[in-house]
């Protein structure tokens, strides 16, 4: 077996529920060596509690956890599930996400992958403070919408994807204008990804004997009620799990090197003059194969 991939997760967990699914998927994946989780974008104390509670449920309080910069309106969709969790009880809580990213990367003997599944404030802050981190790390990024190929009509073509649109300046400072090697997972592959009811029910059943999956499902059910989602159907879109999958394997995904530039409307364009070269996932070979993998991985079958 290959040595596990050293990983940092930079996440806006606690808003859409897919970040929680992505964190659970990481924690269930022996191919990944999670060393740090950083929170970004919204209500940072609440979001950091969400991450801490899931890490604790998995028995992984060895993973360092660092709050980043917020500023946008709070999206506390699973606050009922978080309850009165005491963040000060988390044993590896650090002070600052940007500093934690820098320290983790610069003190590593191996190149680290930073999986970015939220806005890019922490990356921008870390890179501006220490550009040298790009030499010992690479980025895997959920963001953009290139051809709108997998969105099934629910996301308009030539429109800005949220992780870029929520802070275009952070995207430019943290991604486009950096020396980082970038692997991009746009909506073309991460959009329209959801587990149909039989798969979801299998994950729900696994939670009866697995503390992490039990807490994931419990938080998901709170999110459903808060967001008035169809409670007894499939999952909501699980965009960020595609980023985790790409960190594990490139099998089943088709990539192409493209110069990507986000214009002032946050639309991702293929632009040879202004774009940054990125390895972009554009299509699936078999999306059903991914669904089977995700379900089996969360259920502890593989």
Predicted regions located by residue number:
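N-terminal acidic, glycine/proline-rich low-complexity segments
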Residues: 1-302
């Amino acid at each position: 077996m290959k040595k596990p991939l050293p990983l940092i997760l930079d996440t806006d967990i606690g808003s859409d529920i897919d970040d929680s699914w992505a964190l659970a998927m990481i924690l269930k994946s022996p191919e990944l060596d999670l060393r740090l989780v950083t929170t970004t974008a919204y209500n940072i104390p609440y979001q950091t509690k969400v991450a801490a509670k899931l890490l604790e449920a998995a028995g992984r309080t060895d993973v360092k956890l660092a709050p980043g910069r917020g500023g946008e309106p709070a999206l506390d969709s699973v606050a009922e599930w978080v309850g009165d969790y005491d963040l000060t009880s988390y044993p590896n809580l650090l002070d600052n996400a940007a500093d934690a990213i820098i320290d983790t990367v610069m003190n590593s003997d191996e190149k680290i992958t930073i999986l970015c599944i939220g806005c890019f404030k922490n990356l921008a802050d870390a890179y501006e403070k220490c550009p040298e981190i790009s030499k010992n790390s690479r980025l895997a990024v959920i963001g953009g919408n290139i051809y709108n190929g997998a969105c099934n009509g629910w996301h308009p073509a030539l429109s800005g994807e949220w992780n870029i649109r929520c802070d275009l300046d952070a995207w430019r400072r943290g991604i486009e204008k950096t020396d980082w090697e970038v692997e991009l997972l746009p909506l073309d592959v991460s959009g329209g990804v959801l587990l149909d009811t039989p798969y979801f029910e299998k994950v729900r059943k696994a939670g009866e004997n697995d503390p992490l999956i039990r807490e994931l499902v419990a938080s998901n059910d709170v999110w459903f009620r808060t967001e008035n989602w169809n409670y007894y159907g499939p999952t909501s879109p699980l965009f960020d799990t595609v980023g985790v999958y790409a960190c594990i394997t490139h099998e089943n995904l088709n990539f192409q090197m493209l110069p990507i530039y986000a214009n002032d409307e946050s639309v991702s364009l293929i632009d040879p003059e202004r774009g940054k070269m990125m390895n972009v996932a554009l299509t699936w070979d078999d999306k059903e194969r991914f669904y089977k993998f995700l379900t089996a991985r969360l259920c502890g079958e593989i």
